[in-house]
């Protein structure tokens, strides 16, 4: 039985991928997540007998039970291309988010029994940040802590979900259990399109844009295009893939679809105007969950606003599962 801790847990996407790969051979013994709404979604789906810890900077390593695997999707905002690019200097609401990686390392190394594996996920821009120095610092810190790290950028669309989402994945093995070489998973070759993950009709009319709002979006796009900016909404082909879903501004509008199927006619839209004649709508939270590879039995218990943020911040579960299967092979061989 392998024991795991889930840091920066979000709604549990990384844990879910490892649970799927390891089956009954893994047990999560500690969870940390700062955001309270995310904690609620996590607790709904993982009914652990212990409380979720909050601010990781306040966690003492000695208070964390022994574990074999550390899962850490440390906040990507500090390294995001769309963000401020401040990296380790980023200070958000008084907390240096970029340095939270070092809290992961602190919890893993300030203990007698250090974990066998540290697994991290971050934005694809990490290797480019600060001319490569940010990633160099992360890898160097892992090496100094007696770990052998490997990293690779993988795209979610290569692992059975219709989302063009590139992320960097770092796998670091403790030296005494490290293989001579670690192979990241290859694309599975299964093509899925947006049409495959749509919810059954009828779709609530609240997801359909009003004609007034679409006109506003068009004017915004024209204004930004005239300035040479790339701002704007995007309508995705149902036979294609979505762009990377994100939690920031315009995240939903960059993945609009045309859905001519029946929709409920309840007048629930809060935007002035009538439902647009082109049947353009936002994707639903459940469809976003499917874009990330969450199974339909994964509960989405909160309001849409929270769910879009949580799913945009989460990970693509099938990618995590594929990497976790490779990690399990190494650990099983070293037993």
Name each model feature, range by range.
Residues 54, 99-106, 136, 289, ...:
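Short, contiguous clusters of charged residues that form electrostatic/catalytic patches at enzyme active sites
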Residues 59-69, 79-251:
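Class I S-adenosyl-L-methionine
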Residues 5-58:
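SAM cofactor-binding core of SAM-dependent methyltransferases
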Residues 3-5, 68:
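Conserved beta-strand elements of the Class I
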Residues 75:
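Short glycine-/small-residue-rich Rossmann-like dinucleotide-binding loops
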Residues 213-335:
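C-terminal target-recognition/interaction regions appended to catalytic cores
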Residues 37-41, 78, 100:
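Conserved short alpha-helix immediately C-terminal to the canonical SAM/SAH-binding motif I
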Residues 16-20, 44, 106-110, 140, ...:
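Short, well-ordered alpha-helices that flank and scaffold nucleotide-derived cofactor binding pockets
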């Amino acid at each position: 039985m392998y024991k795991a801790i889930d840091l920066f847990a979000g709604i549990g996407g990384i844990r879910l991928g490892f649970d799927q790969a390891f089956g009954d051979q893994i047990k999560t013994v500690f969870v940390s997540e700062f955001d309270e709404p995310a904690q609620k979604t996590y607790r709904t789906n993982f009914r652990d007998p212990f409380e979720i810890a909050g601010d990781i900077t306040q966690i003492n390593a000695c208070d964390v039970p022994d574990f074999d695997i550390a899962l850490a999707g440390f906040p990507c905002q500090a390294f995001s291309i769309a963000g401020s690019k401040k990296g380790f200097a980023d200070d958000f609401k008084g907390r240096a988010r970029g340095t939270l990686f070092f809290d992961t390392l602190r919890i893993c190394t300030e203990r007698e029994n250090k974990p066998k594996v540290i697994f991290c996920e971050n934005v694809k821009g990490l290797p480019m940040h600060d001319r490569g120095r940010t990633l160099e610092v992360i890898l160097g810190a892992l090496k100094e802590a007696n770990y052998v790290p490997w990293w690779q950028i993988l795209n979610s669309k290569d692992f059975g979900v219709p989302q063009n989402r590139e992320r960097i994945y770092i796998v670091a093995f403790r030296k005494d259990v490290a293989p001579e070489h670690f192979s990241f998973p290859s694309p599975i070759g299964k093509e899925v399109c947006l049409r495959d993950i749509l919810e059954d009709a009828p779709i609530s009319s609240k997801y359909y844009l009003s004609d007034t709002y679409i006109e506003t979006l068009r004017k915004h796009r024209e204004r930004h295009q005239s300035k040479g900016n790339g701002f704007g909404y995007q309508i995705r082909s149902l036979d294609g893939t979505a762009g990377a879903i994100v939690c920031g501004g315009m995240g939903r509008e960059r993945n609009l679809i045309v859905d001519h199927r029946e929709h409920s006619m309840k007048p629930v839209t809060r935007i002035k105007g009538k439902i647009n004649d082109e049947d353009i709508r936002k994707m639903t939270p459940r469809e976003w969950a499917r874009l990330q590879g969450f199974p339909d039995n994964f509960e989405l218990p909160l309001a849409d606003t929270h769910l879009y943020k949580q799913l945009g911040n989460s990970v693509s579960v099938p990618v995590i599962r594929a990497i976790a299967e490779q990690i399990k092979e190494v650990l099983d061989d070293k037993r």
